[in-house]
């Protein structure tokens, strides 16, 4: 096992050195380079499970980053952390901000739908069928958008939509 870990550490270090070299020679403004470095450090912290540190790096990156696609990716990663921490409302809010920056992120829609579907299951377990239907309908709405953006990419969601009767025939066109 240690040999695999050493190999993985070597690959991580090699990738970091290569990425840093590329960033140094790229013909981009210093501000954009700093934004990328904060993003990269946030991603590393997130991958290591240090979510509070990752959020700090991501916030610094957002202060500098101007590219909407990159901002959307950073916000999506922040939303994933909030979702992992059980901060569902903040996660949804952050996913929605990510979609404003870059509307072509089906994974944001998928994850919002997961939260809504979870709330629907919870309402059902508590016997509140009206509330269940509200949450399931909201899940179906965002999941339908995700499936349109990424056809065939979320087969489990497509099946849920069909099996729950919440699939529209034009969804797959």
Swiss-Prot record:
It holds the Pfam family TPR_8. Keywords: Membrane, Photosynthesis, Repeat, Thylakoid, TPR repeat. Its main location: membrane. InterPro entries: PSI_Ycf3_assembly (IPR022818), TPR-like_helical_dom_sf (IPR011990), TPR_rpt (IPR019734), Ycf3/AcsC/BcsC/TPR_MFPF (IPR051685). GO terms for cellular component: plasma membrane-derived thylakoid membrane. It is a peripheral membrane protein. It comes from the Bacteria. The keyword Hydrolase does not apply. HAMAP family: Ycf3 (MF_00439). Belongs to the Ycf3 family. Essential for the assembly of the photosystem I (PSI) complex. May act as a chaperone-like factor to guide the assembly of the PSI subunits. This is Photosystem I assembly protein Ycf3. The lineage of its organism: Bacteria, Bacillati, Cyanobacteriota, Cyanophyceae, Synechococcales.
């Amino acid at each position: 096992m240690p040999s695999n870990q050493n190999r993985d550490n070597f690959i991580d270090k090699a990738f970091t050195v290569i990425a840093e070299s590329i960033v140094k020679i790229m013909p981009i403004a210093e501000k954009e380079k700093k934004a990328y470095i904060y993003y990269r450090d946030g991603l590393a912290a997130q991958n290591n499970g240090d979510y509070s540190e990752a959020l700090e790096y991501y916030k610094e990156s957002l202060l500098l980053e101007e590219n909407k696609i990159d901002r959307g990716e950073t916000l999506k990663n922040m939303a994933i952390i909030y979702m992992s921490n059980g901060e569902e409302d903040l996660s949804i809010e952050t996913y929605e901000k990510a979609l404003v920056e870059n509307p072509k992120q089906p994974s944001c829609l998928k994850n919002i739908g997961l939260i809504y579907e979870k709330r629907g299951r919870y309402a059902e377990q508590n016997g509140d069928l009206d509330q269940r239907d509200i949450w399931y309908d909201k899940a179906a709405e965002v999941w339908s958008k995700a499936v349109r953006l990424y056809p065939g990419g979320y087969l489990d969601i497509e099946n849920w939509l069909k099996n729950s009767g919440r699939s529209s025939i034009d969804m797959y066109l």
